[in-house]
């Protein structure tokens, strides 16, 4: 009997233990479900990590310097750069030894000082012995070619304003101060195709406030040139070593004048570059150091061998 009572008392105890375990398990399950429900009830975090924006990497050294023989290149130096330029054009070579192929003939020279106060913007001042001209110029890089190809070209805008400072007399025909001014505007579009080869094309627009005319048989003053002139320039660079490139350009006036059309220019030469200097020596048939003078008045004909020797020297300092 004791065994039966003992056995009988064990079964309810075991049952109570099992029931307690089941209840605890059920409570734990309910608590877990409640916690899960609470977690599920929380609004999902919809914020995502900001995408990593890669900084654009621009193509460098499309050309070696500011000049491409007689034309501006697409390049604008880095911020804080001072640049001093000396440009020289000798006389034409067709007279041979009589003037040492133009080296001892009359020559044009220009000095130019420029500075880059902010990124992509260059301002400059120049002076030339040609008609005692002084000029102010601005160059702004609008678009730059990227290495990943997202921007395939560089685009730069160049503008100058030139003042003829010669004394007014019957040869200069200056009546008003505004008669002394001329202007030049150019959009330069360039692409660096490889580490060694670059091309650029540049449509330009020039304007002279005052131009000489002539009298016809009736005594009426007639224009020789239009006051506005359009032209297209094409230039290229082929790098042959770390410090040397072959350079060339072609300038084609577009506007037809009433009496005297300008002749196109063909130039080719060598560009030698160091860390702080750029030196170009070349032969071509543009004799002026003013782009608007060249596109308006050039009469040197390359078909007749009317070429001249010229050079550009640039010295750069960065602060």
What are these model-predicted stretches?
Residues 245-248, 258, 280:
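Extended hydrophobic-aromatic, low-complexity segments
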Residues 174-253:
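Detector for outer-membrane/organellar transmembrane beta-barrel domains
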Residues 1-37:
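Bacterial Sec-dependent N-terminal signal peptides
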Residues 12-15, 234, 267, 280:
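Intrinsically disordered, low-complexity Ser/Thr/Pro-rich tracts
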Residues 228-231, 262-266:
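Charged helix-capping and loop-helix junction motifs
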Residues 34-166, 170-173, 181-185, 190-193, ...:
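Transmembrane beta-barrel domains of Gram-negative outer membranes and organellar outer membranes
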Residues 26-27, 102, 219:
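Short, flexible coil/linker elements and helix-boundary hinge sites characteristic
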Residues 17-18, 108, 232:
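Short hydrophobic "helix-edge" motifs at membrane interfaces and signal-peptide entry regions
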């Amino acid at each position: 009997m004791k065994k039966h009572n003992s056995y009988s008392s064990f079964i309810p105890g075991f049952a109570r233990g099992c029931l307690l375990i089941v209840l605890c398990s059920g409570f734990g399950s309910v608590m877990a479900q409640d916690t899960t429900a609470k977690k599920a009830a929380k609004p999902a975090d919809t914020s995502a990590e900001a995408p990593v924006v890669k900084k654009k990497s621009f193509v460098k050294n499309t050309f070696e310097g500011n000049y491409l023989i007689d034309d501006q290149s697409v390049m604008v130096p880095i911020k804080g750069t001072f640049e001093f330029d000396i440009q020289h054009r000798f006389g034409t070579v067709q007279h041979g030894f009589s003037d040492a192929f133009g080296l001892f003939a009359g020559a044009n020279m220009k000095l130019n000082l420029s500075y880059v106060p902010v990124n992509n913007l260059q301002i400059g001042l120049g002076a030339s012995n040609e008609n005692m001209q002084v000029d102010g110029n601005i160059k702004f890089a609008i678009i730059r070619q990227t290495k990943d190809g997202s921007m395939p070209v560089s685009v730069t805008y160049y503008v100058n304003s030139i003042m003829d400072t010669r004394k007014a007399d019957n040869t200069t025909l200056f009546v008003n101060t505004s008669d002394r001014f001329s202007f030049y505007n150019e959009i330069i579009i360039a692409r660096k195709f490889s580490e060694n080869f670059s091309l650029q094309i540049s449509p330009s627009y020039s304007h002279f406030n005052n131009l000489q005319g002539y009298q016809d048989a009736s005594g009426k003053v007639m224009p020789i040139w239009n006051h506005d002139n359009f032209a297209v320039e094409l230039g290229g660079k082929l790098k042959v070593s770390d410090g040397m490139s072959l350079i060339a350009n072609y300038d084609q006036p577009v506007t037809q004048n009433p009496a005297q059309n300008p002749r196109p220019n063909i130039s080719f030469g060598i560009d030698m570059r160091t860390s702080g200097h750029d030196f170009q020596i070349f032969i071509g048939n543009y004799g002026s150091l003013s782009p608007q003078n060249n596109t308006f008045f050039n009469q040197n004909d390359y078909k007749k061998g009317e070429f001249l020797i010229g050079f550009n020297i640039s010295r750069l300092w960065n602060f």
